[in-house]
């Protein structure tokens, strides 16, 4: 009976199981399992295990081939309790048997036990070898212990194993997983010999850390060194191309995969290619890849659904979902729900939310994060907050989503508070966190804090990240520092379409439309294809700078040369441009021929043009259309009020005021912000609360007299009666917040330095004239950003050309 059972064991554990640890085994993965309730393999019966133990008791030979094979068999079959019991009965186990046990614990995801067993091995005086350390290092990575990793690395150096490629590959993976790219680079650079796994570990490690640029650069270096990419290299490189938005490089890697036949029949490589084109917005390419796939698993379907959803093809996304379920018999999983959410309006989003709850997909960290994204984009911030607060487990991506939701909904100070909370936690902000929070600094007007986060970016190895640099360009531009915005743009090595759009729009809002146009020509010369946002920025530049002919040329070239259908935003820019000429009959004709129903914003463009040309008839017509859509549009009421007051139509002024009061509409209080010595100072109209009030008003009086201003002005939106206005100083433009902030900036900054002020409303004409003269008088550049554009006052002139 015993002989029969032993022969059965020999048949089960053939000679292949006796091979020592190979390079393939170095890649073994396993999930962490905190207890010992492991899954038992039915291949070994309980009687067989008993016979093996009895054999050891009889033979007392540690090197008995049957027992060695049995121990290896227990470990390979994840029967670690039996393996441990058999091992403990062996008095003198050699390094091979210790390695078998460590490998077994690691393969089962029992990383703590594996590290403890290694310590026991060292304590027993058994010398570890090059087969020991790859699994020990993998277990250290599994418990995320950098301290233990450093100790193991030191031991590897002491034993002279740093020349072993498998040990070094494991160290690279360890350091990359723990976010220590510098240590991984050092190991990689000092390796006397590298294999494809060495390169793959570095390339995928950079990508996992959000450094797609370094990942791509290393992939190129690998090719130069004569290594042929395998499926893992290819998938990592494709992911890096998506991360840094490098369509040209992505297509080159795709072509290489086709030539090397890497993509043939490999569903994961094909899915990576599909995902890359999806993120580029190349839906037709993605469809071609998807339709050409011989095999499609749930991952491929999910990517295609996500492709449609991400690129605004909502109907196609749901049709693809339906086809997957009905024609292919695949059941939607949690990722399907995640990918459908971007295509969902609030109603469909709640439906998917309910479906996920019914299917038991929740709680699920990734799905909950996607729900936060969806509710944030739909303006349902409260729902997003509820989901975030109820999450049992949060990672940095969850924090990124709720921060982005706050920023998207204009809650910039809440976003900054949440970012500080994340900063104080054990989690480390990643590149997406930084890119998400930078717009909040731009909108909160905190340039000094923006510079602090910029310094962090440089120190945190994100200085080559295109997405972050794009956000920095936007932040500096919106904070009024066009020079630093340009410096960040120049630092971008892989400039994508967002990079060019950001810098084109930056110069546009600062009134330098000619430079925006020149940058567009540079963009085309760099072979970066423009998109809808590019032309929106370009047309805005033409409108702000009064380049009418150029604007028409770019508008007509959108469809003709680039195949881009103009959207409602482009028609709005063109209406601004036409309105600038004062040709309102042409503007009305343009509105009638427009293939869209005019929005309140479109009518607002006409209203603004009528204000600049003092055409009250057109203004009343445009305002009437706006009130049909937005009866409580504060800006529209205030603009009409100003126009009536400037025309001396006081009855209409009173009528508008009464109408605003009846609707509970109040005028937005003017507030100006200026930074001095790293601190923001806020002023309101007639403000006397500042500690330097006396000095501010002294400077204001001196400058006002020197520029030849009178002491009293009639303010057009005063609530006082017309006959009383001339007797009042309280509403004089001399006390407007933008002047107070400017004067404080003049006395609190070094002589000759630029003064930058942000104002939340449009500055009045009197203040505009004052600032022009003040810039010439003080020989200082004064930059004022109002609710529409930035004004660069220098030597008595403004970049807006007196049209804003």
Curated annotation (Swiss-Prot):
It comes from the Eukaryota. InterPro entries: DYW_dom, E_motif, Pentatricopeptide_rpt, PPR_At4g14850-like_plant, TPR-like_helical_dom_sf. It is found in: Plastid, Chloroplast. One of its GO terms (biological process) is RNA modification. PPR repeats lie at residues 63-93, 94-128, 129-163, 164-194, 195-229, 230-264, 266-296, 297-332, 333-363, 364-394, 395-429, 430-464, 465-495, 496-530, 531-561, 567-597. SUPFAM superfamilies: TPR-like (SSF48452). Pfam families: DYW_deaminase, E_motif, PPR, PPR_2. NCBIfam families: PPR. PANTHER family: OS03G0241800 PROTEIN, OS07G0578800 PROTEIN-RELATED. Belongs to the PPR family. PCMP-H subfamily. This is Pentatricopeptide repeat-containing protein At4g35130, chloroplastic.
């Amino acid at each position: 009976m015993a002989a029969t059972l032993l022969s059965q064991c020999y048949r089960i554990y053939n000679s292949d199981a006796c091979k020592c640890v190979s390079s393939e085994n170095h890649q073994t993965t396993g999930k962490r399992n905190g207890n010992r309730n492991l899954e038992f393999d039915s291949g070994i019966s309980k009687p067989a295990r008993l016979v093996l133990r009895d054999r050891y008791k009889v033979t007392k030979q540690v090197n008995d081939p049957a027992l060695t094979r049995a121990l290896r068999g227990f470990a390979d079959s994840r029967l670690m309790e039996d393996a441990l019991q058999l091992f403990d009965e062996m008095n003198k186990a050699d390094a091979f048997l210790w390695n078998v046990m460590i490998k077994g614990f690691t393969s089962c995801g029992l990383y703590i036990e594996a590290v403890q067993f290694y310590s026991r091995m060292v304590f027993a005086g058994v010398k570890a070898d090059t087969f020991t350390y790859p699994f020990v290092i993998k277990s250290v990575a599994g418990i995320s212990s950098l301290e233990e990793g450093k100790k193991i690395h030191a031991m590897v150096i002491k034993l002279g194993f740093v020349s072993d490629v498998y040990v070094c590959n494991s160290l690279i993976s360890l350091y990359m997983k723990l976010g220590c790219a510098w240590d991984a680079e050092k190991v990689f650079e000092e390796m006397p010999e590298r294999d494809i796994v060495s390169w793959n570990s570095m390339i995928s490690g950079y990508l996992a850390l959000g450094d797609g640029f370094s990942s791509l650069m290393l992939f190129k270096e690998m090719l130069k060194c004569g290594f042929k990419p395998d499926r893992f290299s290819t998938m990592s490189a494709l992911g890096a191309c998506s991360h840094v938005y490098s369509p040209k490089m992505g297509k080159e890697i795709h072509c290489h995969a086709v030539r090397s036949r890497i993509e043939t029949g490999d569903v994961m490589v094909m899915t990576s290619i599909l995902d890359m084109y999806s993120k580029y917005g190349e839906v037709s390419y993605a469809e071609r890849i998807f339709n050409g796939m011989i095999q499609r698993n749930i991952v491929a379907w999910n990517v295609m659904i996500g492709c449609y959803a991400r690129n605004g093809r909502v109907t196609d996304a749901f049709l693809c979902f339906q086809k997957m379920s009905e024609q292919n018999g695949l059941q939607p999983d949690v990722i399907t729900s995640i990918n459908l959410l971007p295509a969902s309006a609030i109603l469909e989003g709640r439906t998917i939310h309910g479906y996920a709850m019914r299917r038991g997909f929740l709680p699920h960290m990734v799905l909950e994060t996607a729900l936060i994204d969806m509710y944030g984009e739909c303006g349902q911030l409260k729902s997003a907050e509820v989901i975030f607060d109820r999450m049992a487990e949060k990672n940095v991506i969850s924090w990124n989503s709720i921060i982005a939701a706050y920023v998207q909904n204009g809650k910039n100070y809440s976003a900054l508070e949440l970012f500080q909370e994340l900063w104080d936690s054990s989690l480390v902000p990643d590149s997406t966190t930084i890119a998400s929070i930078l717009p909040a600094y731009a909108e909160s007007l905190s340039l000094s804090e923006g510079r602090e986060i910029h310094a962090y970016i440089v120190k945190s190895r994100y200085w080559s990240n295109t997405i972050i640099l794009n956000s920095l360009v936007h932040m500096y531009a919106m904070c009024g520092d066009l020079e630093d915005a340009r410096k960040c743009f120049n630092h971008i090595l892989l400039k994508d379409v967002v990079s060019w759009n950001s810098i084109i729009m930056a110069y546009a809002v600062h009134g330098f439309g000619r430079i925006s146009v020149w940058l567009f020509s540079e963009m085309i010369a760099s072979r970066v294809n423009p998109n809808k946002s590019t032309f929106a920025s370009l047309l805005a530049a033409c409108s702000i700078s009064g380049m009418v002919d150029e604007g028409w040329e770019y508008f007509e070239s959108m469809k003709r040369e680039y195949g881009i259908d103009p959207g409602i935003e482009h028609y709005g820019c063109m209406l601004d441009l036409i309105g600038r000429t004062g040709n309102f009959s042409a503007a009305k004709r343009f509105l009638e021929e427009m293939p869209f129903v005019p929005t309140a914003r479109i009518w607002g463009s006409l209203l603004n043009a009528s204000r600049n040309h003092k055409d009250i008839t057109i203004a009343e017509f445009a305002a009437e259309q706006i009130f049909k859509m937005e009866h409580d549009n504060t800006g529209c009421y205030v603009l009409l009020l100003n126009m009536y007051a400037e025309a001396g139509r006081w009855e209409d002024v009173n009528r508008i005021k009464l109408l605003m009061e009846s609707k509970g509409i109040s005028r937005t209080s003017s507030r100006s912000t200026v930074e001095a010595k790293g601190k923001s100072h806020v002023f309101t109209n007639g403000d006397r609360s500042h500690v330097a009030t006396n000095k501010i008003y002294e400077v204001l009086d001196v400058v006002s007299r020197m520029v030849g201003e009178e002491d009293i002005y009639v303010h057009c939106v005063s609530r006082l009666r017309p006959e009383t206005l001339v007797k009042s100083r309280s509403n004089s433009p001399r006390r407007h917040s933008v002047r107070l902030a400017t004067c404080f900036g003049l006395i609190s900054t070094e002589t000759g330095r630029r003064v930058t002020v942000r104002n939340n409303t449009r500055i009045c004409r009197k203040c505009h004239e004052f600032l022009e003269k003040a810039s010439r008088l003080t020989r200082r550049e004064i930059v004022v950003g109002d609710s529409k554009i930035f004004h660069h006052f220098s030597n008595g002139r403004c970049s807006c050309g007196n049209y804003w």
